Amino acid sequence: MTGEESGEVVEPRAADSPTAAGILLQFAAQAFCRVRDASFIHVNLDSVAHNIQVLKSLSGPNTGIMGVVKGGAYGSGMMKVVEVLVEEGVKELSVAKVGEAVYLRKRGINHPITVLGNLSTFELPDVMQYNLIPSLSWTTPLTSVPRDTLVYPDGSPLRVAINIDTGMSRYGVQPCDLRAMVHTLDDLGVSINSMYTHLQGSITEKKKNQKQIDIFLEATEPYKERPLTRHLAATTGCVQDLGTHLDFIRPGGAITGLSSGADRESAQQFANCGFRPAFSVVVRPTYFKLLPAGRFIGYDATYETRGDEWIANFTTGWSDGLSRRLSNGVGAVKRVKTGELCPIVGRVSMDSITVRLPEAPGEDDVFQVITDDFDDVTSAVGMARNLGAAVYEMPGNWSTRLARVYSRNGKIVHVCNALEYEC
């Protein structure tokens, strides 16, 4: 039950490991100086590398990884995450939009890139120029252009990924229409690079997903001898061990340690695989004061102090990506030094939050708005569960107004400054 449901604010909790806290405090002190701001996003690239190794252990010995890095690698910053994937031997990448793929090409990434969003004709010039692999649910975008335009600069034919609808009912050719689609592509001289589908069910719905896999395998069986690959296991499939024996797995959220499901059972199954969240939001108070009983705080006066209370201000709000629904005790921040959860009181406003502390904070006190763990309140999965939201929204909604600080082995290796478009 959340604070909103019970009418009570989140109360402090016991401390975590002092060793881990000490490391984070030391790291944060350096990071605050680098970003010159009282809040930043921390992306632990060691966790990304670790998660790739977990994914390798969950897939077959001859199965490759197609790393999905759409949406700025789910909020962590696409470029720095991709660099780790390349180091860890990931062979292919995928994104949602052509523009994301072009961004990677312009920064020297030469891996095969599949664009998962359904191709539109006006995207073809960029697809051809940058040697991308577009997804098709029908052949219309290709039949309306001259055949001689469907050739990459090196003279090789356009390669496409066929999306097959096995139950998601969004994009994808119907299995009964696949044969005709393949025939048309053959006539156009277009090469089929892969066939794939997307599972609809959550981590706890294995039977539903198995039905989709059966449909996919039956539909693609006639094309097994062609030089194409098949893939369907995104994060959910990897956790369920469904489709992990095919040519590729296609994880996205798992790369940065994000469960595809927010419910407790899904999150527990995901955590049991050994994944580590890489994303956190680190803050320190910019002002605090002791208020007497009977003071109303913030817009609309939604919180009244019950007695003498230490109230601290933090410069992060809904404009940065923190949900306004975490107002009035639904959400909390974690005090790193002690592990206490300190409730957000009053509204989450555009640029700040007010938090009730058990005492005046010290000069070296550091807090986390989103924690890189599976905490019931402050982690991405905990927040999503309490808000009835998707886990991927929690880091994915954070804007570029906060700097992103990247670490390896506890050391800062890169800072993507605030308001830079992408990292």
Sequence positions of predicted segments:
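Active-site anion/phosphate-binding pocket segments in diverse small-molecule metabolic enzymes
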Residues: 3-45, 49, 57, 100, ...
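Active-site-proximal beta-alpha core segment in soluble small-molecule metabolic enzymes
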Residues: 13, 23, 27, 33-35, ...
